[in-house]
């Protein structure tokens, strides 16, 4: 073989090697440029393919193949980068400094990884729990918790980039695209993974509550509006779009929290053996929104009647603002709060009205009560109407986000 032929063959081998190295990377994943009605401004194929990991984990978790789940969760499977490494679900879930509220709320970096890894390993709150409970926590925790956190992080990252003047398709628009990639996933024929993300959950909950595709339609519109605002360098438009996405996330996972609370009551009544399973599902679903809604669930405890008046987002001093008065000096007396302009119907006398005080402020009361319902160690109360309780605790949240009864719908 002469030198020229050797040189040619070595060059071909080098090129083939280089192409092989890109086989799993952004440029080599053959996806179209849109998903579910959203047209990407940039290449986020690698990010979209991460949803394939979620799909396979759901299958493995359902079969209680914890080693298989752990391998994909930690090492990745579909989202191979151009350098041969993989984007992984654990890599995001365990990362510090992400642009979402979960880690600050739970007081730990990588708070979603703490939850998911404990469920995979059967440790922490999942120590001694059944495979069924662990499966629900893993599936719901990854599909909904990790992927929603990832999406929110990217939308906020887009805003941060835009605030720094980096509005373009390589910067803020790229981050915004990533948000949809993680929320929706690819719907291509050869990579049909869009049934494994939060978007798919929203469709199911819409079916459960008679609201159809309302939340997904609103979320898609907000995503398209946000991208258009980035192109136009309209900061308020981007922020409004992000807030609309978050509002619809709250609707979806409020519906989920209500639904599985209702199932728990039925399970106890029928003694059908599904209580633990549905409790684990509700536990994971509420965790998706807890960090964003808990501050709207404060309350004031009344020492005289031993009840909590549910107020929404307040500070302790608001609990001192109850007074025994009449409306415009006429009619029956009532216990009126001069800050929230609410009337406590739990009390009927001035002495009882005086039972409220700042010292008895109940921070995040509603969120704590929901967590008590979904506590995996709680074996249930056959006399409790869990759906009614969860609805009551979430009502101030819905008021704060401008969420109506029609938005939530009626559980079918």
Question: What are these model-derived regions, one by one?
Answer:
Residues 1-28:
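Secretory targeting signatures
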Residues 23-34, 327-330:
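Intrinsic-disorder/low-complexity linker and hinge segments
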Residues 28-304, 362-412:
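Mature extracytoplasmic or organellar-lumen-exposed domains after removal of signal/transit peptides
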Residues 300-364:
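Extracellular/cell-surface secretome signature
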